[in-house]
A protein has these predicted regions:
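ATP-binding N-terminal substructure of ATP-dependent carboxylate-amine bond-forming enzymes
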Residues: 1-108
């Protein structure tokens, strides 16, 4: 199955969500599924080529190494290139529409 795992987002528990999403993605891949791990807030920003490439992309190391402190959400917002006020990043809805299942690894 093609599964999109949504993690991160804009929550004080963002880092925990990224870590959960990484673990869920790896477990699903071990079971033979095609998995695209996507940060809900940043979406497909920075993805080279079509968003479908995320199904073959390794789990980012940054998703596995989380800090103990809550993230500075103002810094997270400022880091998004398109500066959109939306909580949903570019390409997320389109990627989800093409998946068989969307798994929410969101917290908070």
């Amino acid at each position: 199955m093609k599964i999109v795992v949504l993690a991160g987002g804009l929550s004080p528990e963002r880092n925990v969500s990224l870590s959960s999403g990484a673990m869920v993605s790896e477990a699903l891949r071990e079971q033979g599924h095609q998995v695209a791990l996507v940060d809900l807030f940043f979406g497909t920003e920075g993805v080279e080529g079509p968003a479908e490439a995320l199904y073959d992309a390794p789990v980012p190391q940054a998703f596995k190494r989380i800090g103990r402190q809550a993230p500075d959400l103002a810094q997270v917002r400022a880091a998004r290139r398109d500066r959109s006020p939306s909580s949903i990043g570019p390409g997320v809805l389109e990627l989800c529409a093409g998946a068989d299942v969307v798994y929410l690894a969101l917290h908070g």
